[in-house]
């Protein structure tokens, strides 16, 4: 698995996130194309600077006074010719900010007016960052963030002086999984930075990685530590690290357990799930639900198991190794009772060890020919093995 880790040891803002992504998630030419597609009037520069001895990229945008309603910001994004994925996620980031500001000011977020966040420079930061994230996502990356340093003290906004973290930042954090550290001088985590990281990143949990690339995005202020956001690109050092998530339930009907299984198996982070009949306390009939998940997604899967079953306790069991044979699936033509059928067949390797026809295809043939499925199964295997033996003897 490819990972992109945002190490926000000194906070994060939109321009710092974008600067850290320069050259690894987005090129300068792509940024020019995004600005052209948006049709906004911004003056910006991209430079390399030294921050306390660390070489970092810096993106600077000329700030201008201006405000827009949430609807106006959406219209700018929707009317552009950017990819639909970029539009959708940029709108989602702005909606996070709008909802937070609406909650703080006690108004409908859809009718609100952005002040600093509605200016061209903020639109530039958000949409260019989203473009970079989408590029990395297409390349197979998943996104994580270390605990973000949020700052302390007070900060001036158009509405007046606010404590750090500002109320809008705290509202954004309420709806995200980001972890923060309430420390540092001044405002270190901005609403734009909080919204972008909240939308894309999961909290970083310990797992081994191989570091492939490191990039730094510089902030504007001088602080007691290097004012940079560190982006680490790498790959997990495990190939098949999994956990078994397990819980016992004795108060759900068969229909409810079946529904839970169905919803779990629809998730891309659930590799498999089984239900085992058991007896619980006082010899009550119960079910043990076992779910296999990648290690780095185990907390989300465990939370979903609790939500679907109402269970108050979940066991997460690390599995250090599981052996998976190499597999392939192919479609073979088989003649049965004078009719030819396409049958999907799974094989495992190395060598010819297992052969398994797809049961859905077996069922179709059984219904059409009005013969039992087990007869169809035997006939398919016999025909395939016979044909392969004939080919090998002919050679």
Curated annotation (Swiss-Prot):
Protein name per UniProt: Putative nickel insertion protein
GO molecular-function term, one example from the UniProt record: lyase activity
Gene3D superfamilies named in the record: mk0293 like domain, Transcriptional regulatory protein pf0864 domain like
Keywords: Nickel
Domain of life from the UniProt record: Archaea
Record carries keyword Hydrolase: no
HAMAP family documented for this protein: LarC
Family, per entry: Belongs to the LarC family.
Native source organism of the sequence: Archaeoglobus fulgidus (strain ATCC 49558 / DSM 4304 / JCM 9628 / NBRC 100126 / VC-16)
Pfam families given in the database record: Ni_insertion (PF01969)
């Amino acid at each position: 698995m490819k990972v992109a880790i945002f190490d926000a040891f000194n906070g994060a803002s939109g321009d710092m996130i974008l600067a850290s992504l320069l050259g690894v998630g987005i090129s300068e030419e792509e940024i020019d194309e995004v600005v052209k597609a948006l049709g906004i009037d911004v003056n910006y520069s991209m430079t390399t600077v030294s921050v306390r001895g660390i070489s970092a990229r810096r993106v600077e945008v000329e700030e201008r006074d201006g405000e827009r309603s949430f609807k106006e910001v959406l219209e700018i994004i929707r009317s552009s010719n950017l990819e639909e994925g970029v539009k959708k996620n940029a709108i989602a980031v702005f909606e996070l900010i709008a909802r937070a500001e609406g909650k703080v000011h006690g108004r409908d977020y859809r009718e609100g007016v952005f002040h600093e966040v509605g200016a061209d420079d903020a639109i530039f930061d958000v949409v260019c960052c989203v473009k970079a994230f989408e590029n990395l996502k297409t390349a197979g990356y998943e996104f994580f963030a270390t605990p973000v340093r949020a700052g302390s003290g007070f900060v001036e906004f158009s509405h007046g002086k606010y404590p750090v973290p500002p109320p809008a930042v705290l509202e954004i954090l309420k709806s995200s999984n980001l972890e923060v550290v309430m420390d540092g001088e001044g405002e270190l985590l901005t609403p734009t930075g909080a919204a972008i990281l909240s939308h894309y990143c999961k909290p970083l949990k310990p797992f081994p990685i191989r570091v492939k690339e490191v990039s730094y995005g510089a902030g504007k202020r001088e602080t007691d530590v290097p004012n940079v956001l560190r982006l680490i690109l790498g790959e997990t050092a495990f190939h098949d690290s999994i956990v078994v998530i397990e819980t016992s339930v004795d108060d759900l009907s068969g229909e409810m357990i079946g529904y839970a299984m169905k919803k779990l198996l629809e998730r891309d982070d659930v590799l498999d799930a089984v239900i085992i009949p058991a007896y619980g306390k006082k010899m009550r009939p119960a079910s043990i639900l076992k779910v296999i998940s990648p290690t780095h997604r185990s907390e989300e899967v465990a939370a979903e198991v609790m939500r679907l079953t109402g269970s108050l306790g979940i066991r997460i069991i690390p599995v250090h190794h599981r052996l998976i044979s190499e597999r392939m699936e192919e479609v073979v033509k088989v003649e049965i009772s004078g009719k030819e059928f396409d049958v999907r067949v799974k094989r495992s390797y190395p060598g010819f060890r297992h052969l398994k026809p797809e049961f859905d295809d077996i069922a179709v043939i059984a219904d059409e020919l009005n013969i039992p499925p087990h007869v169809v199964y035997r006939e398919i295997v016999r025909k395939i093995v016979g044909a392969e033996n004939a080919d090998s003897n002919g050679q």
